[in-house]
UniProtKB/Swiss-Prot annotation:
Function: The function of this enzyme is unclear as allantoicase activity is not known to exist in mammals.
Gene3D superfamilies named among the record's database cross-references: Galactose-binding domain-like
UniProt family annotation: Belongs to the allantoicase family.
Gene name for this UniProt entry: Allc
Official protein name in the record: Probable inactive allantoicase
Lineage top rank: taxon: Eukaryota
A single MF term (Gene Ontology): allantoicase activity
Gene Ontology biological process terms in this record: allantoin catabolic process
Pfam family, one: Allantoicase
Length: 413
């Protein structure tokens, strides 16, 4: 994730940087090919950490660099690499980060993309240690089968700014609703790039879903996304719906300490703190559906987990969602249906809970987690069944419920 905004305001500019990096090594991104890796291998492009600089560090090939840097080209052509996305999905925007590359950065670049089947890339040979080397003839022959030169352009040839602190990030919006699995980064003619961030939303094949097992309907890998929040001082809510287990306290949603907390805290007869305020985050599900299981993980939040939380759901059209974003989610209380009542949370622990879905009559499209008074949550999993499956099967051996879905909702299908 990029650096997060401090308060709950969704800006229209560079919103995509709060989405998941589909190419990151953390989610399974992989470099399949690079024409040249002389000063720095292309694998550096998809590292999850920010680039660094070591002033007096050298390798046998030259200055140590934290990025992909090719040799000064002395043959016809230009350099390029192919990356397999760790999460297949819709690309919303791209950040070509040139940090610490000033006299050696790539002056121009373009990005192409394709939607390939898994068996298409089986003949690509694995990459070994590539520093100081160029692609072999065998690798060129194998990658030619992908015909990557003819892939669709997401970003045409564009000039890049040098890697100075105030100009190292080169942002590009992507206007495409297609699903992509691979990208090709072209640099013209040679040089260095520190990081390539491919921001977007995951997209899964819901038709191929196993109808017998609940699925995490809010997972960012499938298309879930945060569409509003009250505070994200130390970590964006999208972190909660990330891939895999949390890696550290930075890999979660954490708010600032509320300034309206009482000078002396008191509890009620049920063991909950009596505090005036709370924090919240709203998510659009990857697919409308019914939530049957809720997982709330406070791992790594040992001295800063919330006292309690609750989860609610609602059903909104796309236009209603856009209106709520403008209104900072001032949705009338009666529109929210309880999925989880106010529940005490324990620090550094995963909480597995049943939802109140059996009481609901409608499929939900959005979910809201509310924490009191403040603090951090590392993971939120909302497991259940997509609406198409719910219509075909009973829920928990109960009589068939009536599900309805308002017209006008655009799911990530």
């Amino acid at each position: 994730m990029a650096d997060t905004p401090k308060e709950g305001k969704l800006t229209r500019f560079l919103d995509f940087t709060q989405l998941i990096d589909l190419a990151s090594e953390c989610v399974g991104g992989k470099v399949l090919f690079a024409t040249d890796d002389f000063f720095g291998p292309a694998e550096n492009l998809i590292k999850s950490n920010n680039p660094s600089f070591k002033e007096n560090e050298y390798t046998e090939f030259g200055k140590w660099v934290d990025g992909w840097e090719t040799r000064r080209k002395r043959i016809p052509g230009h350099d390029w690499c192919v990356i397999q996305l760790g999460i297949q999905g819709i690309i919303r925007g791209i950040d070509v980060d040139i940090s610490y590359f000033s006299g050696n950065y790539a002056p121009r670049m373009s990005i192409q993309a394709a939607n390939l089947s898994e068996d298409t890339v089986t003949n690509i040979p694995p990459r070994g240690v590539k520093m100081g080397a160029a692609a072999t003839s065998e690798e060129f022959v194998a990658i030619t089968e992908l015909k990557s030169h003819s892939w669709d352009y997401l970003v045409p040839m564009s000039e890049l700014k040098p890697g100075d602190p105030d100009s190292s990030h080169n942002y590009f919006f992507v206007n495409s609703q297609q699903r992509w699995t691979h990208i090709r980064l072209n640099i013209f003619p040679d040089g260095g790039v520190a990081r390539l961030r491919v921001y977007g939303t995951g997209q899964r094949d819901w038709a191929a879903l196993d109808s017998t097992e609940p699925v995490d309907l809010v997972a960012i890998a499938f298309g879930g996304v945060c569409v509003g929040f009250s505070n994200a001082h130390f970590g964006h809510p999208n972190n909660m719906i990330g891939v895999g287990d949390p890696k550290s306290i930075a890999d979660g949603w954490e708010t600032a300490r509320r300034l309206d907390r009482p000078p002396v805290l008191e509890g009620n007869e049920n063991g909950f703190l009596q505090v005036p305020g709370c924090e919240w985050a709203v998510f659009r599900l990857a697919h409308p559906g019914v939530i049957t299981q809720i997982e709330i993980d406070t791992k790594y939040f040992k001295g800063n987990s919330p006292d309690s939380c609750k989860v609610d759901g609602c059903i909104l059209t796309t236009l209603e969602e856009e209106d709520m974003i403008r209104q900072k989610w001032s949705l009338p209380a009666h529109k929210w249906k309880p999925l989880l009542p106010v529940t005490k949370l324990t620090p550094n622990q995963n909480h597995l809970l049943d939802s109140l879905t059996l009481e609901l009559q409608d499929v939900i499209t959005h979910a809201r987690i509310t924490i009191a008074p403040d603090g951090g949550v590392s993971r939120l999993r909302l497991k259940g069944f997509p609406s198409s499956i719910c219509l075909l099967r009973p829920l928990r051996e109960k009589p068939m419920l009536r599900f309805s879905l308002k017209a006008g909702f655009r799911a990530n299908l």
